[in-house]
């Protein structure tokens, strides 16, 4: 039996190093096996990158992270150029090692006590009116990092009284009650937790997560905060069927979720799960119609849609693709 890999605290493990730590092995995709991107997946980069550099500089100044950068989001240039960003708290090292995600895995450092104040000041300096806060998974913390979310919500509102806050939270596995108690007095304006894929694919796509647990987290939060909208998102192109996606949508509605995002999965590298299929825009349109028929009040469905992509517009019910 081989010895387990000893991870150093604070070291980021990515790509092949990260995948080597996953119990279910994912063989690197050969270049000839990679699906060619269709025309609708081509991104036009903005001509002016100054706004992008300004936002990156603001992040570096206060030692903050954006999921846009850490997860290699394809919409980074567009969102940064429009002056929006999704902040990632609790460091940039995740205790999980999902094979679809480009965020680094490892043993994270202790949470930075001053991060909530730094985050609030950065948001104030950027003059944001709507902000999305997410985090890595922190299975090493008693509350999964929930109190840190609550502290960030409190500090952001203290300095930015008119802002709207959306939190994209992890599943708080094994500590849901403690986490929800921590969020009780400082909830967000929108509570987002992604199911990511159909339950059949969880062992491959979300090792360490549980489909029913995630649904229960969404249900319990909504029960405690009936006036706060709950939201969830799914990736397409990982081998799921349309019928499976529709069943997930029904499960979400049965658990009180009213906001939805559906987007195309893109493999960050050949070491990650490969794209099984590029879903055409017409199919996203069809799923949006189904979602609205099921009772979702907001449904952003399209190849480039991500949880926080134009989240301010999503919250207003405007069409996002």
From Swiss-Prot:
Where, in this chain's numbering, is [4Fe-4S] cluster 1 bound? 68, 73, 79, 308
Q: Which positions are annotated as binding [4Fe-4S] cluster 2?
A: 94, 98, 101
Care to name a GO molecular-function term for this sequence? Answer: 4 iron, 4 sulfur cluster binding
What does the cofactor section's free text say about binding?
A: Binds 2 [4Fe-4S] clusters per subunit. One cluster is coordinated with 3 cysteines and an exchangeable S-adenosyl-L-methionine.
Q: Which InterPro entries match?
A: Aldolase_TIM, Elp3/MiaA/NifB-like_rSAM, LIAS_N, Lipoyl_synth, rSAM
Radical SAM core domain: which residues?
80-297
Among PROSITE patterns, the record links this protein to: RADICAL_SAM
In terms of PANTHER family, this protein maps to: LIPOYL SYNTHASE (PTHR10949), LIPOYL SYNTHASE, MITOCHONDRIAL (PTHR10949:SF0)
What name is this protein filed under? Lipoyl synthase
Q: Which organism is it from?
A: Vibrio cholerae serotype O1 (strain ATCC 39541 / Classical Ogawa 395 / O395)
Q: What is the lineage of its organism?
A: Bacteria, Pseudomonadati, Pseudomonadota, Gammaproteobacteria, Vibrionales
